[in-house]
Amino acid sequence: MSQSTSAGGSQAVAQNPGAKLGFSMRSASIASDSVPCESGLCEAPPGVLSGAGTVFCESTYKVKIDNETVWQVPTRLKFVKKVGSGAYGCVASFEDTSASASEEGTEDDPSRREQSGETRTSQTGSAEGDSGTNKKVAVKKIGDLFRDLIDAKRIYREIKILKELKHENIINLVEILDPLTPDFEDIYLVSDLMDTDLHRVIYSRQPLTPEHHQYFLYQLLLGLSFLHQADIIHRDLKPSNILVNLNCDIKICDFGLARGLNMNPAPPPNLLPPATHRAGPAAAQDVVCTYTPPDNLSGAGKWGDQKLAAAAGAGSIAATRLVRLAHQQGSSLIGAQHQVPAKTDDASDDMELTDYVVTRWYRPPEILISPFCYSKPVDLWSVGCIFAELLGRRALFAGKDHFDQLRRIVRVLGRPSTAEINKVANEGRGRHFNNPSKGTSNTKRKRSEAARRFIESLPNSDPYKLEDLFPDASKAALDLLSNLLTFDPAKRITVQEALRHEYFEGLHSVEDEPTVTTPVNWSFDNFVPTKRLLQNKVYQEIISYHPEIVLRDFHLLPPRGIHVAPSSLPACIRQPLATLQQQMASLSTTARAVSRSSGSLPTVSRGAFLRTPLSGVNPPSGFFLGEDRSLSAASTAPPDEQSEGIDACGPMVRTASAPSVATSVANQLSVPGGFGAGLCSLKKESSSCGGGGGSARRPPNSGSHQVAAFSELPTAETSHSLPSAYAASLSPFPQAHAQPVSLRSNHVPFASPASQLGLSSSGGGSGGALVSAETLGASGTPAASSSPQVCSTAYSASYSAGFSASAASFASLSGVLTTSASSSAPFARKGELCRETTGQPVTTSDPLSARHTTSTSEAGAGEAVTAAPLSSRGRSELGVSPRVPVTQTAHPYIHKFLAHQRETSRRSSAIVCRATQHAAMPSASLRDRGSSGMFAETKVSLSDSRLPSVCGTVSGHSTSLPSTAAELLAAAQACGASGDGLASCHHASCSGQSCSLPSLGTVGVVSSSLLGLLPSGHPGDKDIEAGLAPDLAFFRGTSFGGRSTSCCVEGVSERSSGFLPNASLTPESSASMALVAALNSFPQTEGEARPGGPLTGHSAPARASHAASGTRCMRSGAETLGTGNGFFSAFGERAATAGPEGAGGSSAQESRTTTRSSVCTDDGAFFLGTPGESCQAQQLPGVTSASLLQQYQKELQQRQFAAHQAQTAQQQKRLQAGGIETVVVEPVQGAAASESNLVGVSRDISFNVGERTVENAMEIEESGRSEASVPQRVSYSLSEQQFLLLRQQQLQHGQQQL
């Protein structure tokens, strides 16, 4: 730090102590503090052309910090070297190439030139030897910021403090780099680059002279004085938190534990600047470092303190020097010094704070004895410990534990009197800093009493003489040290008194003591941390450094609860932002009007694609508009009942009243490559619902069901139907009564979850169809004599873009099974164009083997056709014909549970999928159930308890909610305990009609039991490979926005488990596809059916990635397999990547998949649905996926062990009786055996135990009683005790045979 002479300041030194005391190392230059722009100005980042309405989004690049770390930073930052790493993150030094450009831009402003020139000279001492004019900065990356919410809140607190505190002896937060999305996980903090810290200096071989001690301590006290004047206590002062530069400048850092003494009261009037000054750039929300002259000073004029500080930059050293210069030019400086504030015992100066502060060696006795209330003296004690460590080059009180620290303090300072001990021990008891009537806890009181008794038990010895401890120190230094290390905090010296101590004679100047004109408003710290809330708050702080990102992300901010005041933005940002908001409001109003005119529920549009760019603004190619109050952490307004419905048709309808509006919206929202066209349409008088949301829906007896032929497909332009991406975001439900049915085939290449969900595993094409159960009559009841026919439905290539974390989107899981054509998903899209066939044989195609198989319908199970994929123009490419992803009647099916958390404040959502099965049913049984009303359309209202609709779920009408895992398991068992028949959930439309929601390509779902063995093969299909029977699947993810989101998918079965960690989904991705990817990572063949087995078949990218990854992680006590980024390339660098270097540039060592993952949190609310008319969606706020999974694992092991004991006992009994070895074990659920209930059929189970390198397991070979059943080998995970007992029983069995 430099000191410049001024009139009346004779006590100031005339030379730079830093220049004289510099280390014997190369000098480093530090650029001046950045000057904030004036209101209305907006400077473009370097390399970006500025202009009215230009969106300044910097280009980034990836830089390799070390062998294991890759960062993504702006191109203006040039990597220099890695500085180090710590508990919170990694630090590296960069050169900011934009520093010289910003300095050149200050030539026209005298005040800014003054700051740039003088500050640069004073802080660097000398610029000689500097390689260039680029400013060197330190960039700190904090990865997985929200993994621990307490640590994340500390980092947020530090950001707020550093943003408002501007002082030359406090580390300067230059900026926070653009996170590129509001849903970020990592942040990059840019600060001044310092060469080392005081701890390394003390314990180095660098000689330290008394001048070094004096200069270091003086700067430390200056920075601490600024903090204490702002009523902030640091609470963690130690040498490692004091950064040192090569020219001996120091800066205090690490404000994560800092707290304000007066959190809520209004600031005193004498500290507030005039109102006319608070309106300027130095606004009231900033803490400004200024010099305050005496009141009787005249002639200040335009050189007023506030204006000088604002012109020179808040917190810069030039602010003080300009004030001095002003008084030199025309004012008589009166040498009156500031009066030292008198000590007060006011309760507002104290506060009850946590005792887990201050590193033990620097912890004052009042915290060791009475961790109730403490104040500013705690920092002065720490300064005294640091001063003693500087003098002696070792810690003075290096205690090993709590009591040893007290022992060392008493040994050096002497045992205090009983009165002093009782005073410190009783300080603050019975009062609280905000509530005087609030007392302290019994635990702290007991601890205080124990510490007091311990000190009294120590021998009463004389204190050490400081002259003996520090023989080279001066008397003034020892006197200051003695005043700092005073046992009684009330008698301890204050920071102002320390600065005026004789030890700093010749160095101290009153001008060096800046005053705080505006105290910090600590209201920002009064909140309970959650991930979404912390994300929003940190993002709002980033906006203050990069206001241009508001234009890029403005469509994502309202759903997340982020509200940016236009007045806080520069003029070049406010104007285009207002234009974008007007277009968004206009589009939302149009969607609402058209939606109401079509008879849909009144609702806020859940999403849209805006394709009309503004003049001078470059918005993203597509983004969502709308609102999602369920995930808004900051929004406290109650949800609008009128806006919580779900659009059934949305603005796709062409009505007579607003044809031009529909046409305009359709043209504006057209997506390149999309082809929203309603194929399954109904003849109505004034409207024609269509779009990618599915097929059209009609009331009973309103028209005939019409299936469009391939050549009759209209385009979006001619039918005025919006692209299906927009339709999906508004209406996830099918818009025609097209009931899917399970198909049977004699040839399916493999029985995988992809095929069960109606998806093709071919990466090159796509195909599929929704097939009606029977030819639907006017009433919606299946006709017995009609053969099944394909209901043609058009799906857009970007159909699944309309996802958001709400009930509307999660309810669409069964209807949205597509992904963008631009993504590299290994699975094909479902629901592409197909042609109507009646009475024709079923034709399937295997793209892998180029083999076609034709089969006829059996037992009325249904017929399928090959679905021809679409080109970008909506025409069929008949040359490429992938196989139809048919499902089989006896295969496991997924029972979808809705996830929504409107009534809770949870931030993520979950979809719980229940793997179920049912036996083959005759056509007559299907017709009987259809005639009984299972599939019939009925007119009901939302209040009708017989029809629990999605709308009712959103409105929170569900009752009798299970609250424990056991109740949830029981409810899941009761969900389909019959084991015979089909079920479906009904959902009501706005007009009171219902439509069966397709359950992922199957007619309905019937569960056997939660822990029942689920064979995946059909007794009549011998060629089918053994498939997977997943019992539970979890999908957790944050809000799907216009850019990307993060999610986790986990599936658990009796055979194995799969895990898709921290996947990054783009708007073109599908949540269903992610779920399929996780389930598809399970072993599929008989030889690989074990935990840890390699991925088989399906897709080359997934197979290659999983084979190279082999990553495992533990979640909820179950070992799962990381599939890496094998699903598709958009999974990003935080997924478990394949090999040493992942596709995203990151390594597997950098990836994290832990139980504390910020995305994989078990805070989603679960909805349980029961089949049939009792399909009641129930919210389970008290049940998490972790508890459900743990309960499942526990009961699974109990079931396995019970089955094994029963099998062993029967084997021994048969051996003793001379019978056969193969035994029949009844299932635990005790279901009766019948032809229609495959689950109830007894099984022949034989155990074969083998040693595993990864874990202990046993293999159970299942075979049905029928000769045509497919054997299945399943691996069961056992505990060590169970495995040893099983091994013992096996040995006993072998001995008996011998």
Curated annotation (Swiss-Prot):
<feature type="binding site">
    <location>
        <begin position="83"/>
        <end position="91"/>
    </location>
    <ligand>
        <name>ATP</name>
    </ligand>
</feature>
<dbReference type="Pfam" id="PF00069">
    <property type="entry name" value="Pkinase"/>
</dbReference>
<dbReference type="InterPro" id="IPR011009">
    <property type="entry name" value="Kinase-like_dom_sf"/>
</dbReference>
<dbReference type="GO" id="GO:0004707">
    <property type="term" value="F:MAP kinase activity"/>
</dbReference>
<feature type="binding site">
    <location>
        <position position="140"/>
    </location>
    <ligand>
        <name>ATP</name>
    </ligand>
</feature>
<feature type="active site" description="Proton acceptor">
    <location>
        <position position="236"/>
    </location>
</feature>
<keyword id="KW-0325">Glycoprotein</keyword>
<keyword id="KW-0132">Cell division</keyword>
<keyword id="KW-0808">Transferase</keyword>
<feature type="glycosylation site" description="N-linked (GlcNAc...) asparagine">
    <location>
        <position position="1062"/>
    </location>
</feature>
<dbReference type="GO" id="GO:0005524">
    <property type="term" value="F:ATP binding"/>
</dbReference>
<dbReference type="InterPro" id="IPR008271">
    <property type="entry name" value="Ser/Thr_kinase_AS"/>
</dbReference>
<feature type="domain" description="Protein kinase">
    <location>
        <begin position="77"/>
        <end position="504"/>
    </location>
</feature>
<comment type="similarity">
    <text>Belongs to the protein kinase superfamily. CMGC Ser/Thr protein kinase family. MAP kinase subfamily.</text>
</comment>
<feature type="glycosylation site" description="N-linked (GlcNAc...) asparagine">
    <location>
        <position position="521"/>
    </location>
</feature>
<keyword id="KW-0131">Cell cycle</keyword>
<keyword id="KW-0418">Kinase</keyword>
<dbReference type="InterPro" id="IPR003527">
    <property type="entry name" value="MAP_kinase_CS"/>
</dbReference>
<dbReference type="InterPro" id="IPR000719">
    <property type="entry name" value="Prot_kinase_dom"/>
</dbReference>
<keyword id="KW-0723">Serine/threonine-protein kinase</keyword>
<keyword id="KW-0067">ATP-binding</keyword>
<keyword id="KW-0547">Nucleotide-binding</keyword>
<protein>
    <recommendedName>
        <fullName>MAPK-like protein kinase</fullName>
        <ecNumber>2.7.11.24</ecNumber>
    </recommendedName>
</protein>
<comment type="function">
    <text>Probable serine/threonine-protein kinase. Plays a role in coordinated progression of cytokinesis. Restricts duplication of centrosome core structures to one per cycle and ensures proper formation and number of new daughter parasites.</text>
</comment>
<keyword id="KW-0206">Cytoskeleton</keyword>
<feature type="glycosylation site" description="N-linked (GlcNAc...) asparagine">
    <location>
        <position position="296"/>
    </location>
</feature>
<dbReference type="InterPro" id="IPR050117">
    <property type="entry name" value="MAP_kinase"/>
</dbReference>
<feature type="glycosylation site" description="N-linked (GlcNAc...) asparagine">
    <location>
        <position position="67"/>
    </location>
</feature>
<keyword id="KW-0963">Cytoplasm</keyword>
